[in-house]
């Protein structure tokens, strides 16, 4: 918390607000991180970890709900003005929402109402902890990106439920890290580079598999600027809640189009990794589009110790 407080103090000094993303990896948690067998909505094998995971008990589910509330309190202590709850991309809340990962036959699985139960409890806990002085934003999937996952029709119903719960805004994303990761990012994935930099010496077989059949394991999804725009507009038409756009925001024209289409804000990642001064250059008129090539070397070399060495290839 003290180190995060230094960060938020610096942000506030510049006149801006600070937000932090809160989430739980669920079945994508590495055993080396938690020191035990990872847990998720259902049991099974997760290739991303890679390990077998166990199904959460009801006590663990409710305890995790309480942990989200505690995390909000820590965020307040650290000086954050907003929390973003990650309910997409195949992390824990998403694992409960998606029929691809939720195979339960109790009140936490089955129909959509049951699959939303964990999410609803988490959001209520978060809203209670946030009180009136912190904003609550939720990142959701508009679609998971695979046949047995969530599709747009169910995702709109999930978004409407979050609107009823009183969250302040939704971030509209898509994709499933353990099954359809390139739906999130789009563009090329330098498989051999990713395998080389993976700090997973115990799982040499996974690194070898990535080198041999990585393109089948992580198929490329073509990149285009503002690639989620058409889908996000369907959500804009069905919801009254403030929406935040994400996905392929590299060109000034697209940024203006998004803001003029009823979105209150947009998020960027790779454009800022490529050039941390990108927004200032836009404002000064020095450029109108990020030079990011979407080679995704920033993803392939994201493992600890390598983060500062990829910018030259972005």
Regions of interest found by a model, annotated:
Residues 1-314:
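Flavin-dependent oxidoreductase catalytic cores
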């Amino acid at each position: 918390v003290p180190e995060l407080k230094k960060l938020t103090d610096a942000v506030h000094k510049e006149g801006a607000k600070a937000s932090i993303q809160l989430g739980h990896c669920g079945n994508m948690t590495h055993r080396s991180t938690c020191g035990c067998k990872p847990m998720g909505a259902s049991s099974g094998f997760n290739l991303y970890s890679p390990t077998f995971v166990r199904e959460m008990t009801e006590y663990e589910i409710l305890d995790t709900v309480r942990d989200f509330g505690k995390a909000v309190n820590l965020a307040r202590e650290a000086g954050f003005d907003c929390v973003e709850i990650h309910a997409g991309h195949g992390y824990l809340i998403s694992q409960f929402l998606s029929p691809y990962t939720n195979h339960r036959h109790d009140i936490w699985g089955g129909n959509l109402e049951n699959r939303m139960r964990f999410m609803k409890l988490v959001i209520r806990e978060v809203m209670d902890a946030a009180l009136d002085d912190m904003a609550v934003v939720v990142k959701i999937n508009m679609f998971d990106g695979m046949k047995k996952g969530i599709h747009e029709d169910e995702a709109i119903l999930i978004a409407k439920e979050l609107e009823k719960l009183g969250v302040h805004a939704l971030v509209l994303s898509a994709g499933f890290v353990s099954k359809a990761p390139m739906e999130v990012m789009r563009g090329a994935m330098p498989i051999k580079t990713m395998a080389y930099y993976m700090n997973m010496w115990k799982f040499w077989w996974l690194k070898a598999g990535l080198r041999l059949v990585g393109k089948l394991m992580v198929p490329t999804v073509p990149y285009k600027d503002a690639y989620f725009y058409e889908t996000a507009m369907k959500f804009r038409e069905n919801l009254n809640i403030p929406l935040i756009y994400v996905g392929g925001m590299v060109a000034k024209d697209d940024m203006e189009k998004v803001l003029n289409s009823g979105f209150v804000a947009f998020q960027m990642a790779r454009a800022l990794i490529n050039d941390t001064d990108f927004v200032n250059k836009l404002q000064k008129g020095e450029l109108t589009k990020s030079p990011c090539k979407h080679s995704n070397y920033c993803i392939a070399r994201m493992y600890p110790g390598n983060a500062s060495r990829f910018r030259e290839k972005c």
